[in-house]
């Protein structure tokens, strides 16, 4: 639902706009506690203090389904992530969202890589136990220092052996991280996919940032950037898995353009 982030829309307004454009699914962002912009109706994030059944009512009213929840939290910081993810998994279960998406997050300034992997294993183990009980999947996304390469993302995926853990592949982050060929990477993880972020990267952003950053919050309209979406969709189809393409762009016009472009390829 990042497409309404610059339009001062509340969650319900974002759901209504998604339906108006033609989208079948949304991926809500959730947070702990209360914060001013969401409570005032100027931001789309949902507090997990809300009743998840009420959130589902809003979606049902507009005929919208939930593909997953955006629950990005630093796995390297268990004091933040363990309880947040466990609560998000329970919230997703009641809401009817099959997936919660996350990443390793910015690491603590003082830890070593070895320590970070121990911390991530602890966090993911705690989260996976709850996810297995509730039948929820955890989508690991390439977004930060360790997951920016195919080998790095795989190393995090292998930390915990659980049927609840899969991959939320982000095409834009895979490109910007510069850790390898996007399509070879997608091919290598296609059978682990539980969700997919349809994020395109403008040619200019690619020139300016590729290999210098590990990801970006949102991209340009799908079809306007560097990603070969026809090739991406062909790879996903060979996975024989039902995977939702969750568009990540920053404006309503880009969301409209992305929907129209991708719909022709599906």
PLM features per residue range, with description:
Residues 30-34, 72-75, 104-108, 144-146, ...:
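Active-site-proximal loop/turn and secondary-structure-junction residues that shape catalytic pockets
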Residues 61-62, 95, 133-134, 163, ...:
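Helix C-cap/helix->beta junction micro-motif
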Residues 8-9, 15, 25-26, 125-226, ...:
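Acidic/histidine-rich catalytic cores of soluble enzymes
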Residues 92-113, 134-147, 246-247:
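Active-site groove signature of glycoside hydrolases
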Residues 244-256:
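A short, acidic, flexible beta-alpha connecting loop/helix-capping segment that sits on the rim
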Residues 1-99, 115, 121, 125, ...:
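N-terminal pre-domain/capping segments
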Residues 221, 230-233, 237-239, 243-245:
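H/E-rich (His + Asp/Glu) clusters that bind or coordinate divalent metals
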Residues 1, 26-28, 66-71, 100-102, ...:
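Hydrophobic faces of well-ordered beta-strands that scaffold small-molecule active sites
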């Amino acid at each position: 639902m990042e497409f309404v982030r610059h339009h001062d829309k509340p969650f319900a307004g974002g759901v209504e706009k998604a339906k108006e454009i033609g989208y079948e699914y949304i991926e809500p962002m959730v947070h702990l506690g209360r914060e001013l912009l969401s409570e005032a109706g100027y931001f789309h994030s949902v507090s997990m203090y809300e009743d998840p059944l009420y959130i589902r009512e809003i979606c049902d009213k507009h005929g919208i389904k939930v593909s997953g929840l955006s629950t990005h939290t630093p796995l390297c910081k268990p004091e933040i992530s363990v309880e947040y993810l466990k609560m998000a998994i329970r919230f997703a279960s009641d809401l009817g969202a099959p997936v919660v998406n996350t990443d390793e997050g910015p690491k603590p300034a003082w830890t070593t890589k070895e320590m970070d992997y121990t911390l991530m294993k602890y966090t993911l183990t705690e989260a996976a136990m709850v996810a297995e009980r509730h039948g929820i999947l955890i989508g690991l996304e390439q977004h930060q220092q360790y997951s920016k390469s195919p080998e790095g993302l795989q190393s995090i995926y292998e930390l915990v052996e659980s049927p609840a853990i899969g991959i939320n592949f982000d095409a834009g982050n895979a490109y910007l991280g510069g850790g390898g060929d996007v399509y070879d990477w997608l091919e290598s993880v296609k059978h682990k996919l539980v969700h997919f972020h349809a994020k395109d990267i403008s040619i200019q952003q690619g020139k300016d940032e590729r290999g210098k950053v590990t990801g970006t919050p949102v991209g340009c309209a799908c079809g306007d950037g560097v990603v070969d979406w026809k090739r991406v969709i062909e790879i996903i189809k060979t996975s024989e898995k039902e995977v939702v393409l969750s568009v990540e762009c920053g404006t309503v016009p880009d969301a409209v353009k992305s929907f129209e472009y991708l719909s022709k390829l599906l």
